[in-house]
Amino acid sequence: MNSKKIEELDKTTNHLDNSRNNMYSCTFMEKGDEDNILNSTILKMNNTEKGISFQTIEEEIKDKNKISNIPSDYAEKEKYCFNELLYTKQNGYINIIEKEDKPIQEILTDDKKNISEIDSSKSDKMDPCLSSQKVDEEYKYGDNYNINGDNPVHNSDEINEDSKCECSFFISKCDYEKDSDANTNGPKKSCKDSEENINYYNNNLLLGISENKDTLIKCDKIFERSYYSTSASTVLASNENEQNLQNISSYETVSSMNEKIKLDGNGKYEKLEKEQTYIMNKETNVINPQDYSIHDIGTYRDECISYLNKIKDIPHNIGSQINSYQNNNIIGNNNFKDKSYLIHENDFFDVETKKKNILQNYFLVNNNNEINANEDMNNRSDDLKNIEAVASDLNEIIEEDTIQKKINISKNCKIEENINMNINDHNKNAVFNFNINRQLFHDNQGDENMYKTNFNTENNKSINIINGMSKEVYEQNSGDIHAQVENINNIEQTTNNIIENNMMIIQGSDDLRFTTLNCINDNSNTDIMKCKRKIKNDENRENIMIKTDQKNIKMKDELDEDDKDELYGIPDKKRRKKNKKKKIPGRVYKVIVRGKECWRAEWLVQKNQENIEREKEESKMDRYSIMKLENTKDVDKNINKMNTPNFQKKSKQFSVSVYGYENARLFALFELIKYNSVPDSLKEEASICIHNIKRNIMNSENSSNKSFSGHFLQFLLADENNEYSSLLYKRLEDNVIQNVNKYSMHEMNNINRMNLFQTQGKEIGFRNEKYFTVQYDNENGHGNNIVDGTIWNIQNNERNLFYNNNNKCRNDYYYNNSNDIIKMKKENNEKLTTFNDNNFYNKANYINRYNNPYVSNNNPSIHNLNNLVYNINSYDFNPMHIRNGYGNDSNSTINISSPNSNYHRGFGEEKDIQKKKNFFNINNTRKYVGDINNKPMDGFKQNLFEKVLNNLENNMGNNNLYNYNSLEHHINSKVKSTYPYNNDNITNDPANTTTMISHGANNNQISNETEIRNSQQILHDNLLVYRNFMNPSSCDIGNVDKNSENDRGEKMASNFEGAFLNKSNIVFKQNANFDPFLGRNVSNINT
C-alpha cells in the first residue's frame, strides 16, 4: 500500500461504501521473547461508522490480561509470537488467534523455501509494522506477494508510537482469478491496489474481508500446505445479526489455494468451491465441542456405543479409529475404516473391563494421513510415547490426532474432567475448538502458562476451562490443549444455555447429551456414592450397577426412601408429588382483545366433524349412507394422550362492552354447551346459565337482537324444566321429550333413528312405562286426543297387535339384527342415548317442554313464561291440549297412531287399502299418493281429512301465518270421517283443510297474542296424522311369515327413503334447511 492509502485507513472518519453494513473488527497482538507486546493492532469496522481505522491497544491489552513474567525457558529455547483474542460482544469483532512455536521470521523463510529461496538480506529487511510503501516481489510461480520490507519505515507514529515491531505483519489487497486451477503447484493470484478486497496476512494465515459484507476469503498461501497454523489456529467470527461469538474453525487439509467460505445470515458457512476438501458445510454437520469438553461421553457402555456410531460418519472422521485405554493399557485395537461399520462394545471393551469398570478413559484417533510412527516418536510427549509403544504392534502405525478424556467424580460430587488433545502437523481433519474468551494467567507454581476460559451463561453459571501451554507443548510442537472442567453444578443446563445463546454454531443432537450425576454420600460407607442418573436398561430391564475403581455408583431406582428424601432435599421425608395436569374438554376465561375486556370460550372439537356434517348436508345421502359414514368416522371423544391428534382447539370470545359483563360470560359458556365441552366444574353454572339468559334477554328492554340468532335458539326456547335444571334427574320420569328435532337433519340423524318409545326410559332419559298414567279426554278413549297415552305402553300385547310375541309379527325393525342398517342404527343409538354426567347436555335432550294440559282462550299461555316460550315457537305443531304429548317441530311428516284404536283391530280389513298406496320421490319431494275406498273409518281415523290439504296457504294470501314452502307432503285420498263433522260427506272448505306441515320462514309475522292462539288452534284442528303401511307383506294375525321381518327391513329404505319406524310404527321425516326465526318478528309480543 502507498502512504496515502495507509493514512486514509488510519482515519476513523474514513467511510467505505454505504452498502457495507456488516462490519467487523480484527485484533492482532504479537508478542516477542520478552514480557511485552510487540505490536497490537485493531482493524475496526464499526457498524455505525462504517469506517476502517487502525488503533494500537498495547497497554490496554497488557492491563486487561496481565501479561508479564513469561518464563525465560521459552526465550532460551526459541522465540514465539502469537495473536491473542479480544472479543467485544457489542462491537462484534472478528478475532484471529495464532499460536506459533517458531519465530515469525523463521516460519516465513521456511514456508517460502518450496517456492523460492529468499535472500537473507531481504528477510532481515522485512518490517513487521505497517509501512507507507509497498514492494512487489515476483516469485517463481508468478505470484505477486506484497511485503513491506524494501523501504521499511520504523517511525511508528503512523501507527503507534509505542509499538515495537519485531514480528511480521503484512497487509495487501488481493484479487483472485476465477479460473484458478487448484491442481497447479502454485496459486494464481494478482495483488493490486483494488478496492474490492482487503486482506490481512499474518504468519501463514491470510483472511480477506470483501465489500460484499458476507464473504470471508481465504487467500492464497506462499507455501503449499494448510493455511491454518501447524498447532491449533482458530478463527472466531461474530455475525451482525446475532452479535454472538461464532466458531467457524476446522482443521482441514486444503488442496486448493483459493478456497472461499461464504458466511450466511445464520453464522454458518458454505463452501463455494473445491469439493475435494472437507470443510464445514451449511448444515454444520460436525461434532459439538460440548461433547468433548463438557459431557461425560463414553462414560457408560451403551451410551458410548450409541455416540460413536453417531459420529463415525462425521466429515472430519473423528472417531474412525477408536481405542480404549485403561491404566495406559490398550484394550481394543480394531481399525474402523468402513464408515458403514457399526461399532460394537466388543470392539473396545473386553469382558474383564465390563465387569470392573465402565467409567474409563479413551482416545479418539484420526487415521487420515498414515506415516511411520518412528519418525515422530521422539516428538511426542512422554505420555503419548507410552501409548504409541503399546500400539506399535498394529499393522499400520500412524501419527495421530488424538483426544484423551478422563472423568473423575470426587466425593463432594464435583465432576473433574480432563481432556488432552493433540493435533498433528500433517493432519488437519479434526475439530476441537473452544468458542470462548481466554485470559492469560499463571498457576501457583509458576512453571506453566495457562489460559483460563469462561463460558458465561444466562443463569450466571460459569464453566472454567483451563488450557495448558506447558513447556513441553512448545518444545515438542505437539500443540496439546489441556482442559479441565471444574465446579459444574448442572452441565446439561449450562451447555443448553450456551447453545441457545448462539455461542457455538456447531450443533449436536439431543441424543448426544447426557445428564449430570447428582450424587450424595452414604455416611455408612464412605466408598459408596449414590447417584441418580438416567441410563438404558439391559435386556432383562434391570438397572445396571455401575462400578468404578474409586467408588460404587448406585442408580436412582436403587435408592431407598431415606436416600431419596436426602437426595431431593425434602424435609420430614415427605416427597413432593407432581400433580398431572388434567386436560378438560373446555374452559371459559377472561381476556383482553384490542384493549377490550372479553370472555373467551375455548374447547376441543373433532377435526373431521365439520367435514362430515357438510358432506351429509350437501350430498343428501340416504339413511344407510349416513350411518355408514358416521361409523367409519367414529372417534373416541375422551380427551387423552392417544387421541389428542383427533381434536383441534377452537375458541370464541364475547365482548363485555357489547353483551354486558354477565351475559358475555354466559354466552361463552353457551359455546361450551353447544360443542358438548362443558367441564365438570362448570356444570352447575350451566344449569343457572339457561335461566339467566332467558331472564336477561327475553324480559329485558335492552336486549340485543343477537340473542335470537344461531345456536342460542334452543336455549331461548327452553323452559325452566330443561335438562340443565338441578332437578333434572327427578323430572326425567315425569316429562317426555316433545320437540326432539331442534337441529338439522345431519345433527339429529342419530336421534331420529332412536326408538324413542322403548320402555327402558329410566335408563336413557325417557319415560318409564311404570310411571305413566294413561289419560283420555272422553269416554271412548279417543276424543280429541290425536296422540293418546296408549302409544307409550308398548309392552301391552293386548293393545299392540304389531308387537305380539305370540304371532311373531312386528313392525319394529329396530331389533331386527339380521339387517345391517338396523345393526348400525342400534350402535349409534347406544352411543347417543346413554344419559349420564358425561353427556348430560346430549343433543337428544335439547327439548321444548310445556306442562299446561291445554291452551284455550280462557287460559292464555302468553302470560306465562313457559307458555311464552311455547307460543313463540309457533312452528311447533304439537297439539296444545295434550299433556305429555309428542310432536316434531321441524318440517316433517309425523305418522302416529294409537295401537289401542279400532284401526289396528281392523288391520286385516284395511290390508287392501295399504296395497293401493305408493311412495315415490320426485325432485326430493316425497309424496304420498293413494286412493282409499269409501269404507268408513272409525276411532283414531276421525282426524283424517278427505283430500290433499295444500290450498290453505294460497287462500290465506300473503298474510299467511304459516308460509310453509320448503317441502310439501300431499295425501290425495278421500277419507270419510265421523269427527269433527256430523255427516259422511267431506267438505272441501279450505278452512277445514291444511297443507301437510312443510316448514319455511319467509315473511312470517306474529303480531299479537290472539294470532298466536288462533294459529295454534288452526294448526291443531287441521293436523294430519296417518298410519303407514308402506311395506306389503303377508304378516297378519294368524298368518305369520318367518321371513317377513327381513323383507320389510330390506324394503324400508327403498320405499320410504329417510324414514324411521319405531315400535309404534311412527315415521319421522326431517328437513335440514328449516330456520324457524328467519325473517320472523317477535318484538310485538306482549309479555
UniProtKB/Swiss-Prot annotation:
Disruption phenotype: Asexual blood stage is normal. Female and male gametocytes are formed but fail to develop into mature ookinetes. Zygote development is arrested at the ookinete retort stage; however, meiotic replication proceeds normally. In the zygote, transcription of several genes is affected. Infection of mosquitos with knockout parasites results in a lack of oocyst formation. The keyword Transcription regulation applies. Its main location: nucleus. One of its GO terms (biological process) is DNA-templated transcription. It is found in: Nucleus; Chromosome. GO terms for molecular function: DNA binding. Keywords: Chromosome, DNA-binding, Nucleus, Transcription, Transcription regulation. This is Transcription factor AP2-Z. It comes from Plasmodium berghei (strain Anka).
